[in-house]
C-alpha cells in the first residue's frame, strides 16, 4: 500500500512553498497563504495518514490471524503515523509562531520568510515518515509476490 498523501505532502514543501516565497513581497500576504495552505492540509492529510495506518493495521491483523508474519505491516503502520508525534514535538512552535504573526503581530518579511522556510524543511522531514511506511509496505508486498509469504 502506497500512501497517497506522500506526493501531496512533498508537493507542498517542494513546489507550493517555494512559489509563495518567490512571489510574495508582503509578509501579510505570505502569512495568509501559509494559513490557507495549513488549513487545507490539516483537514485532509491527517485523515489520509490515519486511514493508511489503519489499512496497514488491517493487513497485519489478517496476516496474524492466518499465522503469517505480520511485523512488517505493523512497522509500516507505526512508521506512517509517527508523523503525528513528530508534528507535536518538532513543528508546533513554528506553527504557533506563524499563526501568531498571522493574527496581527508585527511581522517583518525576513522573519516570516525564515519561519516559513523552517516549516518547509520540517514538513519535508515529516513527509518522510509516511514515505518510509509506504516503502516498507511495498517491499513487503513485492517480497510476497516474488517469494511467497515466508
Swiss-Prot record:
The keyword Membrane applies. It is found in: Membrane. Keywords: Membrane, Monooxygenase, Oxidoreductase, Transmembrane, Transmembrane helix. The keyword Transmembrane applies. GO terms for molecular function: monooxygenase activity. Pfam families: Anthrone_oxy. Disulfide bonds: none annotated. Its main location: membrane. Signal peptide: none annotated. It is a multi-pass membrane protein. Anthrone oxygenase; part of the gene cluster that mediates the biosynthesis of geodin, an intermediate in the biosynthesis of other natural products. The pathway begins with the synthesis of atrochrysone thioester by the polyketide synthase (PKS) gedC. The atrochrysone carboxyl ACP thioesterase gedB then breaks the thioester bond and releases the atrochrysone carboxylic acid from gedC. The atrochrysone carboxylic acid is then converted to atrochrysone which is further transformed into emodin anthrone. This is Anthrone oxygenase gedH. It comes from Aspergillus terreus (strain NIH 2624 / FGSC A1156).
Amino acid at each position: 500500500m502506497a500512501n497517497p498523501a506522500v506526493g501531496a505532502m512533498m508537493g507542498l514543501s517542494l513546489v507550493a512553498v517555494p512559489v509563495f516565497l518567490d512571489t510574495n513581497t508582503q509578509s501579510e500576504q505570505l502569512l495568509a497563504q501559509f494559513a490557507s495552505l495549513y488549513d487545507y492540509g490539516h483537514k485532509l492529510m491527517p485523515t489520509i495518514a490515519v486511514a493508511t495506518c489503519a489499512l496497514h493495521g488491517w493487513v497485519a491483523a489478517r496476516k496474524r490471524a492466518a499465522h503469517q508474519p505480520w511485523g512488517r505491516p505493523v512497522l509500516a503502520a507505526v512508521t506512517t503515523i509517527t508523523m503525528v508525534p513528530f508534528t507535536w514535538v518538532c513543528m508546533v512552535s513554528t506553527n504557533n509562531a506563524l499563526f501568531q504573526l498571522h493574527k496581527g503581530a508585527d511581522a517583518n518579511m525576513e522573519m516570516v520568510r525564515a519561519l516559513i522556510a523552517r516549516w518547509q524543511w520540517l514538513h519535508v522531514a515529516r513527509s518522510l515518515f509516511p514515505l518510509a511506511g509506504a516503502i516498507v509496505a511495498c517491499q513487503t508486498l513485492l517480497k510476497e509476490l516474488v517469494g511467497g509469504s515466508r
